Amino acid sequence: VIEFGGLSGLINNASVYQPISFDELTFEEFKKNFTIHVEVPFLLTKGLFEQLKAKSGSVIGLVDTSQGRAWKDLTHYTASKNALRQMMVNLAGDLHPHVRVNCIAPGAIISAAWEIEHFASVLEKVPMGRSGEPKDIASAAKFLLESDHISGQIINVDGGWTLVE
């Protein structure tokens, strides 16, 4: 950070995704999701705020497209990702004008977290007819990090999935 003259961006990208039926869901697993998806981004943002403020920086939270939807066996995941989404929106109001805060909501992106059977059924519903790739998320993040007049926004990077789902 010192070598590059300070910190101008933070991307809260840590995640855990494991479908678990509600009857098998433990409080420990529920809490783990909130720790990774909400507590860690809070602590990082809080701990790095002064450095970000000094550079008029940007914070990005990777949320998901689950808001307002019921996803089977993902109560713990969707509850924590939507808590992160709301925290980021609130931080956009709390940290302005010093730090911009936005979210990226990935749709079907090729990753080790997706089970191939589930992935195939999701792709059938994506208007663009293909999955996204990590570079699609990186492009959105680069755009938000460089955009000095965008804050409090959620960008869906989902090939149009949320339009039809």
PLM regions: where:
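Catalytic Tyr-X3-Lys loop
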Residues: 8, 16, 23-42, 60, ...
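Conserved Rossmann-fold SDR core element
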Residues: 85, 95-109, 150-157
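Catalytic loop of short-chain dehydrogenase/reductase
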Residues: 58-83, 88-96
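C-terminal substrate-recognition "lid" of short-chain dehydrogenase/reductases
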Residues: 133-157, 162
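Conserved NAD(P)H cofactor-binding loop of Rossmann-fold oxidoreductase domains
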Residues: 13-18, 160
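Amphipathic alpha-helical dimer-interface segment in Rossmann-like NAD(P)H-dependent oxidoreductases
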Residues: 36-54, 92-93, 97, 142, ...
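Substrate-binding pocket helix/loop in short-chain dehydrogenase/reductase
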Residues: 21-22, 29-31, 114, 122
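Catalytic Tyr-x(3-8)-Lys segment
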Residues: 117-136
